Design a protein with these regions (language model features):
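Short glycine-rich, low-complexity/disordered patches
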Residues: 50, 101, 196-197
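Flexible interdomain linker/hinge and immediately adjacent N-terminus
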Residues: 127-171
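Short flexible/disordered coil segments
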Residues: 132-140, 188-197
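Basic/aromatic DNA-contact patch characteristic of tyrosine site-specific recombinases
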Residues: 1-42, 48-55, 59
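Basic, Lys/Arg- and aromatic-enriched nucleic-acid-binding interface segment
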Residues: 167-196
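Short amphipathic alpha-helical face segments that pack within enzyme cores
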Residues: 49, 112-116, 188-191
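N-terminal core-binding DNA-recognition domain of tyrosine recombinases/integrases
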Residues: 30-45, 54-146, 176
Length: 197
């Protein structure tokens, strides 16, 4: 792997970076984006997840001998194919070298982090806007009668989301859980959840 992520502490803040192992230097665009996320007071878990994801994309670009500017300047169909290829790269586990398939939701979240980087670089004036991203408006009337509208960015090429596999707890399951409870508060909370469904 050519690109890796890491972190350093400066006082009470933790800063994340993406490093090129061939040159030993920081990957400036990714590191600048991660610093921006820290300065926006995003949670450390969020920034850590993004820092964990970006090297996979940078390695993907490196293997294809592309730069982010090359991708941003592609035509719509080429960009669509590029990001679909990245989704498959992650989905099939090629990004880690284990070739173990990951869930669609995981692959989609990795691509969302990449789009966040492209959006940040566009706002900084370093890259043009991606052709595959679509700005959409959403509006509704609030309960007090005012019109509320917002704009969001959409991408139509995400993989289908995985359905959550859940099962209903039986009476025996609940009794088993209640018998394992150490205190009355937990018993009460579980009983209330059972009553309310």
């Amino acid at each position: 792997m050519r690109y890796i992520s890491g972190h350093v502490k400066k006082g009470r803040k933790t800063y994340y970076y993406v490093k090129d192992t061939q040159t030993g230097s920081f990957e400036k665009s990714c590191t600048k984006y991660l610093k921006h996320k820290i300065l926006q007071n995003r949670s450390l878990n969020t920034v850590n997840r993004i820092a964990y994801t970006l090297p996979y994309y940078m390695n993907f670009l490196s293997e294809r001998e592309l730069t982010m500017m090359d991708v941003a300047n592609m035509k719509f169909t080429d960009q669509s194919e590029h990001f679909y290829d990245f989704l498959m790269y992650v989905k099939n586990g090629i990004h880690t070298g284990t070739y173990r398939e990951v869930k669609n939701n995981t692959a989609n979240s990795y691509l969302q982090a990449v789009f966040g980087l492209y959006n940040f670089l566009h706002r900084c004036g370093e890259l043009p806007y991606l052709n595959v991203l679509d700005d959409r408006n959403f509006s509704y009337v609030s309960p007090v009668g005012t019109n509320v509208s917002s704009t969001y960015t959409a991408y139509d090429g995400y993989l289908r989301s995985n359905e959550h596999q859940s099962r209903v707890a039986t009476k025996e399951d609940i009794e088993l859980i209640l018998s394992a409870c150490q205190n009355n508060r937990d018993r009460l909370l579980i009983s209330l959840m059972e009553e309310t469904g």
